Regions:
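Alpha-helical transmembrane segments of multi-pass membrane transport proteins
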Residues: 1-427
Length: 427
């Protein structure tokens, strides 16, 4: 009964158009002060202890690094490198977009940032080269979702905060699925380009490829700094985030010189605004998690599933359906922070690896970012292409269907996610 009251109140507040963070906070406070005897002091204590986690500090640093790289011309150099490598294949610029999104995802940690950085440069070039606007929009909107699967990933950090799972293990677990999804999206792009005979670029010489690689190498080295540093134990994921922010600043301002010193305060302010917004969501989500635990809702869900003989396969299918439905109305950070505290205890009780479950949630978030009505990538791509959301929804379907198929593979083949972190001794 209490669960129905909590989720009913949350749904009503969200339907009024109230921001997710405020809806969460009001739901918790209303329930606590009217239907429980929980002391106010314990609520305040939980509020502060819940956000004292060291991992949370990684979020603003990864956001800052992504903003420096987005404004610093790194994306343009990555696109040139990607085009030199695959531009001569069918759908060359489209394949270059997939590859560039994968590379930029490995340094930004954000899907919308990836779509903006790559799409704003590549989409006009694709249209100019003779590609249909729909094709380019479909490629970039879906490939941009790689930003939260290929590490570093802000959504993975939030999952770690919500479930106390190792950030480093999550990052390593995202590498192979991220590359596999990039290959899948590239395959769809190549097939459609060949089917409709879309244009190909002239084949670049190895000299041109080497020149493009040298121009982009400073941005690509950030991948080595973050992932190499975490794996070798030189620094923790949070320290890696701080290092990536400093490196991205040096790269954008002093090496590439695409960002002037006078532009740095604007980047810092934008990063601070986004970080504050996410921290506010986390704060209210911590309270929501507290009330879930206090009312034993995850435990009751686990007991119900076990009592009805529902096993791992049925539970994971239910999770996918629930998370995909939530993706229709909420953005990834909110979904992870609301649903992870509810579903995670059940997953652990059923023997599902916490790292594998985290990757499943992240892939669900990727799909959610590419379908209406609240798919963030669709709105970002719409702003770049000037296409309507309905038209854009039709454009992304071939890639979106392949992502749904990939979701099933990730869900029921744990080795795809767990092989690398197990080999590295991280789990």
């Amino acid at each position: 009964m209490n669960a129905l009251v909590i989720f009913g109140l949350l749904a009503v507040l969200m339907l009024t158009g109230m921001p997710i963070s405020i809806s969460l906070g009001l739901t918790v406070l209303t329930f606590l002060f009217t239907m429980t005897q929980v002391p106010l002091e314990s609520v305040a204590l939980k509020l502060f202890t819940g956000i004292e986690k060291f991992e949370i500090m990684a979020i603003p640093f990864f956001i800052l690094a992504g903003n420096f790289l987005t404004h610093g011309g790194v994306a343009k150099r990555m696109i040139n490198f990607a085009t030199s490598m695959v531009g001569h294949w069918y759908g060359g610029l489209g394949l270059a977009g997939v590859l560039a999104c994968a590379l930029f995802a490995a340094v930004s940690g954000s899907s919308p940032a990836t779509v903006v950085a790559i799409g704003s440069i590549l989409l006009p070039a694709m249209v100019k080269a003779g590609f249909p606007n729909k094709f380019g929009a479909g490629v970039i909107a879906t490939s941009g979702a790689l930003g939260i699967l290929i590490p570093p990933s802000i959504v993975m950090v939030m999952y770690s905060v919500a479930t106390n799972t190792s950030v480093g293990a999550l990052f390593m677990a995202g590498v192979i699925p991220g590359l596999a999804l990039a290959a899948t999206l590239g395959g769809v792009t190549w097939y459609r380009a060949k089917k409709f005979n879309y244009p190909r670029q002239p084949k670049a010489t190895w000299g041109e490829r080497w020149k493009a690689f040298r121009a982009s190498v400073w941005g690509l080295l950030l991948i080595v700094v973050v992932m190499g540093g975490i794996y070798t134990g030189i620094f923790t994921p949070t320290e890696a985030a701080a290092m990536s922010a400093v490196y991205a600043f040096i790269c954008a301002v002093f090496i590439y010189k695409d960002l002037g010193i006078k532009d740095v305060p604007k980047v810092l302010l934008n990063s601070a605004n986004m970080s504050a917004m996410l921290l506010y969501i986390i704060t209210n989500a911590v309270l929501f998690s507290f009330i879930m635990t206090n009312e034993n809702i995850p435990q009751a869900l686990a007991d119900w599933m076990m009592g009805n003989g529902l096993g791992v396969i049925a539970f994971l299918l239910m999770c996918n359906v629930l998370l995909l439905l939530a993706g229709n109305f909420m953005e990834p950070s909110s979904i992870v922070l609301i649903f992870a505290p509810i579903l995670f205890p059940v997953a652990i009780r059923l023997g599902i690896d916490p790292v594998h479950f985290g990757i499943i949630m992240v892939v669900n978030m990727e799909v959610g970012m590419c379908h209406p009505p609240v798919g963030l990538n669709l709105y970002v791509a719409s702003g770049i292409t000037k296409m309507g959301i309905t038209e854009l929804t039709v454009a992304v379907w071939p890639w979106l269907l392949s992502m749904l198929g990939f979701l099933m593979v990730v869900t029921y083949w744990p080795a795809l996610s767990l092989w690398l972190p197990q080999r590295l001794g991280m789990i």
